[in-house]
Amino acid sequence: GGYFSPYVNPNLDDGPKGEYLTDRIGNEVVNFINKHQNEKFFAYVPFYSVHTPIQSKKEYQEKYLNKVGDENHNRADYAGMIESLDENIGRILNKIEELNLSENTLFIFTSDNGGIRAISNQFPLKAGKGSYYEGGIKVPLIFSWKGKIEKESKSYERVSNIDFFPTIKKIIGNRDKKLQLDGVDLNPIFKGKSIRGRSLFFHFPVYLEAYNVHLDNGTDPLFRTRPGSVIIKDNWKLHHYFEDGKIELYNIEEDISESIDLSIINPKKTKELFDDLNEWRETNNAPIPLKENPDYNQRFVDSVNFLIINKKYARSITN
């Protein structure tokens, strides 16, 4: 399906012909808030935008056609989609304000992953969606709560979407201690306090194919990421890949692009993070593949890598 009705989506009723999906979702949420304004409510609003297919309303795309972007962001259709998203988020916030619900409503804006390199370059972050590098896992995050969170305040704490549930649980006064929580309560951050000393873990023991073997800037030409794990502790980030045991260490405070691997020159920090990662995997029974794939074809991989290298070489001569 696409962003214009009829949507060809079995989970979505069609609207009037030509209806724009982002507007449709905005309307649904505004109507929901109107209906439940005198009750406690929770609205999870996963806008399809911005996601492929990249389809903007014609008038919004035309608005950006003659505007100059930069080296990494220069697509009128993408910009038009973002404006529609921004407009509908504004409608939701305005409705909350109009109904005098702002002081009793926590608003969270975020994303599930980094952008796709082929559509929107994440520079200076490395790689993009599907990668362990910052371009794949670092996303925007905004909390808004009138009277509870200082306007335009900023925090540089590293947090995760798994923290939302414990945070909301605390706010609504749920005292159920039997729940096993992976995240932490972020309410102290709302008051300007710190939750430092907490590490973040990412574990993905499978393969994820590359979008573009030349430009994805992942661990290798064939995959955006290979089976592995990552730990972020303070300003340090360690990657561990299962196939060959490869380890990469970065200081992401000084090197957000993850361009300088410090694992060899800083063995003490490498061991510290690797030990922490192993302890976390053992505690959580994180699966690690140990059996080799009997259908693995090394000759095919070598031939693909050979073609890739030769195409890169040909382009460098042309340029």
Where do the model's predicted regions map?
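Long, internal low-complexity/basic segments
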Residues: 164, 201, 207, 243-246, ...
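C-terminal cap/loop subdomain of S1 sulfatases and analogous C-terminal strand-loop tails that border
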Residues: 115-120, 124-132, 149-150, 157, ...
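Histidine-centered active-site microenvironments of extracellular/periplasmic hydrolases
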Residues: 53-59, 94-148, 160, 309, ...
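Loop/turn elements at helix/coil->beta-strand transitions in domains of secreted/extracellular proteins
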Residues: 37-43, 101-107, 195-198, 234-236
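Active-site rim elements
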Residues: 12-19, 74-79, 148-158, 171-178, ...
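Active-site His/acidic residue clusters
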Residues: 29-77, 116, 122-123
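A long, amphipathic alpha-helix that forms part
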Residues: 20, 24-34, 62-104
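Formylglycine-dependent
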Residues: 1-41, 47-49, 53-56, 211-221
